[in-house]
Amino acid sequence: MAPQRRGPPRVPEGNSAAERRHANSTKKDRLPQEAQRTWLRIVALGVSLALVTFLLWSSAGIDDDVAEVVAHRGEVLEGRFIEVPCSEDYDGHRRFEGCTPRKCGRGVTDIVITREEAEQIRRIAEKGLSLGGSDGGASILDLHSGALSVGKHFVNLYRYFGDKIQTIFSEEDFQLYRDIRQKVQLTIAEAFGIRASLLYLTKPTFFSRINSTEAQTAHDEYWHAHVDKVTYGSFDYTSLLYLSDYLEDFGGGRFVFMEEGSNKTVEPRAGRVSFFTSGSENLHRVEKVLWGTRYAITIAFTCNPDHGIEDPVLT
């Protein structure tokens, strides 16, 4: 019998071949995992960048429907005035020749009230508001009527605190208040070409302190658009004296004149006076305060002596 031909004996598979196949298999499995990890890193980076951008945007108090800043915080304006057509709001009220607005507009100046005066009158606001304060984000102090925010309500600080008021405020405080009111009144009269003696202080004229605390009542919702002549029928000329600085003391909280397609905004600066006619030609709102505390005083004037109020007196 012829011998059977056999091939070379089968050698058992060595560890090296098995390891090569295992390595190839592992490498194939690893590729999708690495791609997934790379993708996740890209997504995480994108989210981080978006978050940083949002935080920077928010901290600056940017409002995306504001088209133009007419008064930057860093500017020191001798005077800037923008004339706009008067609305018909004044027609529904008794007119006073030589005072009722025929020239309408808005102005800003940084040279009427000094920063030192603004700091001094802010301390008056701080002393008064230390007696109370709203549970929400907006607190009011009215030295004329005595109205003070306390919790979710208002009290008359003169009746509520009685003789203690003499230890909180001084006659110098009230004299400074009167001096500043007079300076603002003269500024408005000059800008609109009317006699200052025809303007009467009217209510409400008040300090405001706004922070980012969530609103608790309708009185805390200061950010809604409104017209002063509609909200307060006595107003003919409105002014605001800012007592703190945008982006230093607070974020958000800018003043926005609302116009179709091109809003105009004023950035608060301590000592800055913003003033305007009170009709619908100056529809406006205040941005929500996002951080910090914003102080200001609203000083309103009327042409109707029947709606006039006296300067506050410390008695």
UniProtKB/Swiss-Prot annotation:
GO (cellular component) term, any one? membrane
Which residues are Fe cation-binding?
H226, D228, H284
Topology, Cytoplasmic side: 1-41
| Region (Disordered) location | 1-32
Residues noted as binding 2-oxoglutarate in the record, renumbered to the chain: R294
Q: Which cofactor does it need?
A: Fe(2+); L-ascorbate
Protein name, as recorded: 2-oxoglutarate and iron-dependent oxygenase domain-containing protein 3
Q: Which organism is it from?
A: Rattus norvegicus
In the UniProt record, the gene name given for this protein reads Ogfod3
